[in-house]
């Protein structure tokens, strides 16, 4: 799911620390985790910002939440890194993302499935025969783009089993419509309440804490940024709040190149009280 925001809609306070707490908070019903804006990137130009993003995703234990947004037959979250997920509405760009879709059922069965997606195309699942993933596994995910964001590649490596899946493709395009390059205005490290192909939105499981290790994003000259090392105008921290239940479901932290996204169920009257 692509996340479109305007700076004026952001909530939060800033401080001098470079741990992500200096970023404005942005509340929605889908994303949890940090967004890092590329330095000196101009959205109206054809310049390229980040051309690589990576992190190692640690597969958390999943359980049925005590107070979910609603009760369902399957609780799911997508756990991913991306390029170009935060855009203004007048720019034709496509989110290039890869990671793991995590699900748990009431009988305790769990499933961890690798995926990649270039929005607006549908996600492509990675079968377990190509990349088996289990609780506790460390999945190193790398996204790259070339040709000014019109071509991309990804690798997902299970560091516990040494199995690697690779994929490359051109940018998504609509039939007789525009092409959606990922020119790297932003990089993201996110746990998301995404949507199934029938457009029904996921309901989060309880994942405790989902960790991204060795997270960074780099431009084509090799200059790299960490998720939380920007100033207050170079990033934002997203969090999931549902107004109908008056509940905040996530809280995120950054320490160096490590991102931690915690599942919580905190009742509060509004996001102003977060």
Regions found by a protein language model. Give the residues of each.
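Fungal secretory targeting signals
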Residues: 1-19
């Amino acid at each position: 799911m692509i996340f479109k925001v305007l700076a004026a809609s952001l909530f939060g306070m800033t401080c001098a620390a470079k741990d992500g707490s200096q970023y404005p908070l942005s509340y929605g019903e889908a994303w949890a985790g940090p967004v890092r804006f590329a330095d000196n990137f101009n959205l109206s130009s054809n310049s390229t910002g980040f051309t690589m993003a990576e992190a190692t995703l640690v597969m958390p234990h999943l359980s049925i939440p005590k107070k979910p947004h609603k009760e369902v037959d399957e609780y799911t979250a997508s756990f991913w890194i991306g390029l170009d997920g935060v855009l203004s509405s007048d720019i034709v760009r496509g989110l290039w993302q890869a990671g793991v879709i995590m699900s748990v059922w009431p009988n305790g069965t769990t499933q961890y499935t690798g995926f990649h997606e270039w929005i607006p195309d549908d996600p492509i699942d990675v079968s377990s025969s190509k990349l088996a993933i289990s609780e506790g596994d460390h999945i190193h995910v790398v996204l790259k783009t070339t040709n000014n964001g019109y071509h991309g590649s990804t690798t997902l490596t299970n560091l516990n089993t040494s199995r690697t899946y690779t994929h490359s493709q051109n940018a998504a395009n609509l039939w007789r419509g525009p092409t959606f390059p990922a020119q790297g205005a932003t990089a993201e490290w996110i746990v998301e309440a995404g949507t199934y192909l029938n457009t029904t939105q996921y309901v989060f499981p309880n994942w405790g804490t989902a960790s991204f290790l060795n997270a960074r994003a780099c431009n084509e000259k090799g200059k790299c940024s960490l998720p939380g090392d920007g100033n207050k105008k170079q990033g934002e921290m997203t969090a999931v709040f549902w107004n109908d239940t008056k509940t905040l479901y996530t809280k995120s932290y950054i320490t160096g190149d490590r991102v931690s996204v915690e599942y919580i169920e905190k009742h509060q009257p509004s996001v102003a009280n977060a």
